[in-house]
Structures are given as structure tokens and as C-alpha cells.
Amino acid sequence: MPSNMKQFCKISVWLQQHDPDLLEIINNLCMLGNLSAAKYKHGVTFIYPKQAKIRDEIKKHAYSNDPSQAIKTLESLILPFYIPTPAEFTGEIGSYTGVKLEVEKTEANKVILKNGEAVLVPAADFKPFPDRRLAVWIMESGSMPLEGPPYKRKKEGGGNDPPVPKHISPYTPRTRIAIEVEKAFDDCMRQNWCSVNNPYLAKSVSLLSFLSLNHPTEFIKVLPLIDFDPLVTFYLLLEPYKTHGDDFLIPETILFGPTGWNGTDLYQSAMLEFKKFFTQITRQTFMDIADSATKEVDVPICYSDPETVHSYTNHVRTEILHHNAVNKVTTPNLVVQAYNELEQTNTIRHYGPIFPESTINALRFWKKLWQDEQRFVIHGLHRTLMDQPTYETSEFAEIVRNLRFSRPGNNYINELNITSPAMYGDKHTTGDIAPNDRFAMLVAFINSTDFLYTAIPEEKVGGNETQTSSLTDLVPTRLHSFLNHNLSKLKILNRAQQTVRNILSNDCLNQLKHYVKHTGKNEILKILQE
């Protein structure tokens, strides 16, 4: 009996026959879904690198401490279009990286690209099932471009993307900063995927730098809550669309006014400084603030031993998912119990204190659970946005609308959409998520690092994976984008490369810039620019 397929339902089946090692790498990098035609409206084409040198480079980077280069190279080999013959290699096409492919020459059975000078021929032995829009090409020489002008596919049916909302009432100093950042992000994503400057990263670093320099007790309070995704950090710290209540994480008097932050940019190398904040989680030397009740000094465990915190969190996670009654009634109640213990006693499984007293006081009355569900949802939406082959304003607008109208932070318990037991009651029939899908998302949330979140030092990212329950097999494919992987968040973060020449120390420069911004002392600014 023949052992090889003659027709293929998947590109991965063809790879299994031709290069199982490369298929294993793609699978280990969680990129198999990128080869599925179901992911793309226009089918998918895979460029197989015939050159052993390219495949060896992919392997070397894939199994290194930073697999981002392997991911980027593989993305350059995936085209979100069905291109079966050279005749279809026309118009606005590009790779999954978003880089436009410029064709220099097409022949009867060959395509030569300008950028990268790749020579491509259709794979003679790849024949997809008739209903599958799949194609495989062989790259005989050259390479696929990793950088270059972006491509923009025309939309079918006409019309423009809904714009990112730019107006909201009431219009506060917090919303003003958020709207400015959202507009800047939309603009730079259209230009270069924010590869040069990420506005969310810049503002998050600037706010944290301001707190570190001017309000160290506030800095200590918020540091355990920061997230590797600067977009998430920005919204959780600023809370720009909250209109009810005065329980802001950072008070108005600190953010605004003559001595406030006021949105000032305070950074020299945003990405490096942002990562540095995570290393401070285990290197705090000024945690000598006595507990207000006992008058004793307790160094919060989120600072002194974050690994143990995550170990106890894993115990809670395992207990919930391996409980003898994992269902839509028991499971959400167990999640709420875990958060109630943390909010009321500052412990996880009676181990604590987890957070500084000021932090836990700011997270009571459902705010901690609301924050972590917020992380989970925004991570998923942001990851979906960044995984698209082309940037669409409508996708980003959906994130903004979710933050403004569904999760502004006005009523924490009522804004819980996944974790609230009320969502699974017999009488609860409203909402736009089917009960099984909602429960699958709850299981994914429990399995994510967003569950009972505490910021983890950068050197710990990419460690042991969370133990999962067999229930995760129930998660529909379209919901896998909600799973939170720190490495993918770091990949988004590493798109930003913001550096300037350091003349003075970062702290000194930041203090001077803030002084100039709010006093108009332009002579000092001239000196800094020399």
C-alpha cells in the first residue's frame, strides 16, 4: 500500500511527508493554525525554503532563549492568499509579516521577487482537496523579505473601516490622554505596525517613571499590577473611561495639576526601561513600610518571592479544574472564592501577605477580579489584532469600544462577563456569548497567567507552562486567541525600538524634562538638545 498522500487536506500533512523536523518546529512555536485556510478569508500559501541554510537558521533561533526571529522568518513564508500559479502572483499581496511582495518577473512556472530576490516555483507534488484553498511553493534561492513597505489589500464590497472613536463624554484629563494615545497608535500601526514607536509603551513607561521619581509609595502600590503588554498596563493604571466612583488606582491629584504627571513623556529607551520595571519586582530594597494594623514590617511576597506566589496560584488552579464537579455552577463560584480570599486576607491558600497593603486596599470590592478579567479579554483582542496579516482600524476600534462602553470600571461586579457566577445561572439568558463558549473562556482564563495575576520578573517568562485540565480541549478554535502566553506578549513588546543618546542619567533627564514641560524654561531644553 502507498504510504504517501497524493492529495492534501492540510499543508501540515504535506510537511509531515517532506520535512517533519520543520513541521515540529512550527508546531512547537504554536504556528500550525497559521497554515490553516480556515484562518484566512482568501486561503493560504506556504513558501517552503529549499535552502538548508534557511531551515537551519529557523531551527537555531526556534530553540534559543528568544524564538522571535524564527517566528518572524516563518511568518515571511506564509501568504494569507490562495496563489496556485504564477498568473495569480499579481496585485497587492504580501506575507503574514505585513510586508508587500514586489514581483520582478513571472514565467510559465516561476516567480522572481524583487525584494529578497526569491525564486519561487509551485510544488509539483502538492495537490489540495478540491474544496481547500491551499498552495505550496518551493523557494529555490534567495529569501523572503522581512522588512519593507506594507501592503494593503482592498476590501470587498467597498466602504471604509469604522473609525476609532475620538469623542466621549465626560471629557476628562484621563480621557484626553487616552484618546491622544489611541490616535497615535492607529496612525503608527497604519505606517509600520508601530515598529519604531509604540505610543502605549511610551506613555506606560513615562507614567511609571514619574511615579518612581516623585511618588515612590504609589510606585510600590502599582508595580505588582503592571503587565508585559503595555496596552494593558496603560489602561489598568490610567483608567481613562471610569466615570463613577473615586476609587481610581492612581489619584487625580498625583496625575494632574502643577506638580502632576500630565501625560509628559519621560523616557530615554522605552523598551529597556519597561523591562527594567519587571526586574525591580524582585529587587526592591525600600519595602520597609509597616503594616497599619500590626505596626510590623512585612515584605510582600510578590516582591520577596514571586515564584512561590505563582506556585500557590498553580495549586489553586489545579484544585479548581480537578474538582470533582467542574461545571457552570461550581467552577465560577470557586474562582470567586479564590479572589475573595485574596481581597479580604491578602493571601493565596492562606499564604501571604501577597501584595503591599496599599495595593490590596486598592483592589477590594471585586476590583482585582475585574482587573484580571480585563487583562484576559484585552490580551485576546490585542493578540488577534497583532496576528492579522494587515492592520485594520476596525479591529482596534473594537478594543477601544470594549474599554469605553463594556468595561470602563464603573461597576466592577456588573462588568464581569466571564467569571461572574450570575452569568451561568438558569435565569440568565442575556448576553452575546453562548453559555458553552463563555464557560470555555472561563476555563481558558483559569489556565492563563491572568488568573490571580501578579507581575512576574522578565527572566521567569517562558518557564514551565501552566498545568491544564482536559476541559481545555473544549475551547473552540476561535477562542484560542484568548489564551495568554507571555512570550507572545514579549514579541509584541519587542516591536518597539525607542532609543536616544544618553547624556545624563535617565532619572536626571526625566526630572529635567518634566520641569521644562511645566515651567516653560526653554533654555534648559536647548541645553538638553545640544
From Swiss-Prot:
Ubl conjugation in keyword set: yes
Species of the source: African swine fever virus (isolate Tick/South Africa/Pretoriuskop Pr4/1996)
Family, per entry: Belongs to the asfivirus polyprotein pp62 family.
Annotated site, Cleavage, chain positions: 158-159, 463-464
Keyword Disulfide bond: yes
Induction of the gene: Expressed in the late phase of the viral replicative cycle.
GO cellular component: host cell perinuclear region of cytoplasm; virion component
Lineage: Viruses, Varidnaviria, Bamfordvirae, Nucleocytoviricota, Pokkesviricetes
Keywords per UniProt: Disulfide bond, Host cytoplasm, Late protein, Ubl conjugation, Virion
Protein name: Polyprotein pp62
